[in-house]
Amino acid sequence: MLPSQSPAIFTVSRLNQTVRLLLEHEMGQVWISGEISNFTQPASGHWYFTLKDDNAQVRCAMFRNSNRRVTFRPQHGQQVLVRANITLYEPRGDYQIIVESMQPAGEGLLQQKYEQLKAKLQAEGLFDQQLKKTLPSPAHCVGVITSKTGAALHDILHVLKRRDPSLPVIIYPTAVQGDDAPGQIVRAIELANLRNECDVLIVGRGGGSLEDLWSFNDERVARGIFASRIPVVSAVGHETDVTIADFVADLRAPTPSAAAEVVSRNQQELLRQVQSAQQRLEMAMDYYLANRTRRFTQIHHRLQQQHPQLRLARQQTTLERLQKRMSFALENQLKRAGQQQQRLTLRLNQQNPQPKIHRAQTRVQQLEYRLAENLRAQLSAMRERFGNTVTHLEAVSPLSTLARGYSVTSAADGAVLKQVKQVKVGETLTTRLGDGVVISEVSAVTKSRKPRKKN
């Protein structure tokens, strides 16, 4: 009989599955260094090979989606560094690794150091965006920390000369490759901060291999950039080259030329902006002057409409119209009277009594005389009223007042002067007389004294 607490019994499938899950979950992703052997690539495009060292070996698979990113062709006997996941092929119980990335062993070890330093500095907050310093805009002096014989310096100076020839540049020459390079780069950064001549620094070099660029992955350089009080722009290698210095710097430029573009002003663009602003200002001034001219024309037209001479002309027209109406009315009245006389004469002739005719003629003569007298009296009264109206209009006309020896003086803004306090010495005054205008300049202002009251 079996004991009461019998041990767990696994099927082969369950055992392999359990081991696979343990390997995948507990081990996770690892970096492995070894020598390639038995490398094959079937039609599927996947890679199958063995990684080995002097004492052991392990089977490896690298699927097509992953091996497409490898930049070299693996060779038998080549030392490589791979990043892989450990798993178990359950049908055969074979323990193997699934490779995600592969690098030659030398670069691979450097890449591993790079990732370790990157994680360390990131954990310390050296990459924090909130700690990045703002670049000056515009920069008044640029410091360049690079090799004095490298192509990077030539590219930077060429771009700065093209974009902003007047921008001062101070070069802090240093080695950018080799064992002494990190220390020299740090000392150059410290010197630039000590001399405090520049308000922005470009730290970088031209392109190269990972080993060539390794000085900018050095922890000392990273901490030197982070400690700089002057904003730092990193410009290391080409656009695809990313170093620790790029993460720590206040701004990363993909190339040295791009760094020069970032820290400099494009004077041609500034000139275009100034010219554009000038054009907009000229258009605004033209628009303003056009509006002022239109407003002046409107005001001038209104003043012309209100001119005393124009008002007198309108009154004269009205009087002439009334005179014509009056003359027409008198003519109509005389015409009607004549017609009435003719009718009466006709009636008298029809009756033909001589006495009545005589009396009627006498009566008619009297009526005619009275009518003529009345008409003459009315006409005389209307003419007298018309003459009085014309005389009154001429008396109240400003032109008549000016013709009698008076004048009207106004200030430069057109205001009519009534008191001496409206005038200041040096102002230009306009005096209108009966026959013209006098322009004068005030040389003195004297206010008349009020007479003292006698006790």
Curated annotation (Swiss-Prot):
UniProt record similarity statement: Belongs to the XseA family.
Primary localisation category: cytoplasm
This protein's name: Exodeoxyribonuclease 7 large subunit
Molecular function (Gene Ontology), one example: nucleic acid binding
Xref: HAMAP family: Exonuc_7_L
InterPro entries: Exonuc_VII_L (IPR003753), Exonuc_VII_lsu_C (IPR020579), OB-fold_nuc-bd_dom (IPR025824)
The protein's role, per its UniProt record: Bidirectionally degrades single-stranded DNA into large acid-insoluble oligonucleotides, which are then degraded further into small acid-soluble oligonucleotides.
The organism of origin for this protein: Escherichia fergusonii (strain ATCC 35469 / DSM 13698 / CCUG 18766 / IAM 14443 / JCM 21226 / LMG 7866 / NBRC 102419 / NCTC 12128 / CDC 0568-73)
